[in-house]
A protein has these predicted regions:
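Helix-rich catalytic cores of soluble enzyme domains
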Residues: 1-91, 95
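Acidic, glycine-enriched catalytic cores built around paired aspartates
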Residues: 63-78, 83, 87-166
Length: 166
């Protein structure tokens, strides 16, 4: 089991909202979406349906770039024929999504997005408070980030057995 489509959309809308203030004349934000390889079913027919449904959902994020992950890639490296088929499935899903009702406005999506934004702001404030006063950017400071992990503000299970992750 994974995240529901509505909650996955809320999560990514929260991420978009949180990074939007970074956009200025010197910094652009380009949104690229793709399906997670591990989310693809191994069954070929199910994988085709998953590719279409996931593409349709991702269009709610209005990506600048859509990265196609072929429906066969959970089973084997995509062949030329697999890629052509995946492109056809994806193209149709995108065409269907254009002009569709705006899933971003669903009340449950908006409610969860706002919860995630608020929780993330609390976390970012807590990380900022950990930094010494002479640190210009606490969110890019290795010592501050390491401290946030060791104090349990952020998870980093992949560092458990890494001497630098302590």
């Amino acid at each position: 089991p994974g995240t529901s489509d509505a909650m996955d959309l809320a999560k990514m809308l929260a991420a978009q909202e949180l990074i939007a203030p970074l956009r200025d004349g010197q910094f652009n934000i380009w949104t690229q979406t793709r399906i997670g390889l591990l989310s693809h079913p191994l069954d070929d027919q199910s994988a085709r349906g998953h590719l279409a449904a996931s593409t349709y959902l991702q269009m709610a994020l209005r990506p600048d770039i859509y990265h196609i992950v072929g429906h066969t890639e959970a089973d084997h490296a995509a062949t030329a024929d697999d890629i052509i088929e995946a492109v056809k499935i994806t193209r149709r899903a995108i065409q269907n999504a254009l002009g569709a009702p705006d899933m971003r406005q669903a009340p449950e999506v908006q409610t969860r997005k706002e919860e995630l934004v608020a929780e993330t702001r609390v976390l970012l404030d807590a990380i900022r408070e950990l930094a010494p006063s002479d640190v210009a950017d606490p969110w890019a400071d290795p010592a501050t980030l390491a401290r946030s992990v060791t104090l349990g503000l952020m998870d980093a299970p992949q560092l458990r057995n890494n001497k630098f992750g302590r």
